[in-house]
């Protein structure tokens, strides 16, 4: 009597364990973060980025830039880790200057698993939206930048567009 009971108990435990693993694998995290003027220290031609250059209004130098990258990486790499150990499948970002800052961000400790999508838009300051994604959790199938329609009274017509990304979650 004892052996069949232990065998049934073993089967129940295995079933619960397999179900928990399946649920854990099906749990994904998504995040959004406004990185608030993530500018590098290099002037972009045809962009109004002078405030974020050495000697500019914010005296934006290598030390400030590097410090901001480290702080952002620390925050982003810890998002949702208690609930989803692998971290977010993707993270939307606002106010990114260009691909150089994203290259630098994904090289920071804790961010190495991420790749990114970003398009240069017409914003006069040069800030754009971007998507960081972990290719082990999310496969990009298509992406594009959709420019916003000018609104009544808009005289510049130069603003960030909408980043549209299609993809599949990993199974």
Regions found by a protein language model. Give the residues of each.
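Basic side chains
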Residues: 2-3, 68, 160
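Generic low-complexity, intrinsically disordered sequence content enriched
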Residues: 10-15, 73-76, 106, 136
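A generic structural signal for solvent-exposed, polar alpha-helical segments
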Residues: 13-16, 39, 45, 139
């Amino acid at each position: 009597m004892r052996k069949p009971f232990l065998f049934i108990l073993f089967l129940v435990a295995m079933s619960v364990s397999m179900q928990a693993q399946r649920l854990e694998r099906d749990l994904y995290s998504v995040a959004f973060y406004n990185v608030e003027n993530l500018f590098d220290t290099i002037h972009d031609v045809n962009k109004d980025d002078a405030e974020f250059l050495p000697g500019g209004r914010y005296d934006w130098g290598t030390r400030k830039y590097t410090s901001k990258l480290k702080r952002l990486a620390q925050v982003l790499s810890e998002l949702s880790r208690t609930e989803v150990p692998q971290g977010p499948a993707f993270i939307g970002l606002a106010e990114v200057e260009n691909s150089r800052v994203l290259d630098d961000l994904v090289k920071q400790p804790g961010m190495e698993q991420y790749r990114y999508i970003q398009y240069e838009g017409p914003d006069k300051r040069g800030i754009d939206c971007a998507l960081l994604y972990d290719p082990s959790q999310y496969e990009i199938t298509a992406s594009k930048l959709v420019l916003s329609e000018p609104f009544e009274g808009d005289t510049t017509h130069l603003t960030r567009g909408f980043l549209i990304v299609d993809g599949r979650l990993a199974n």
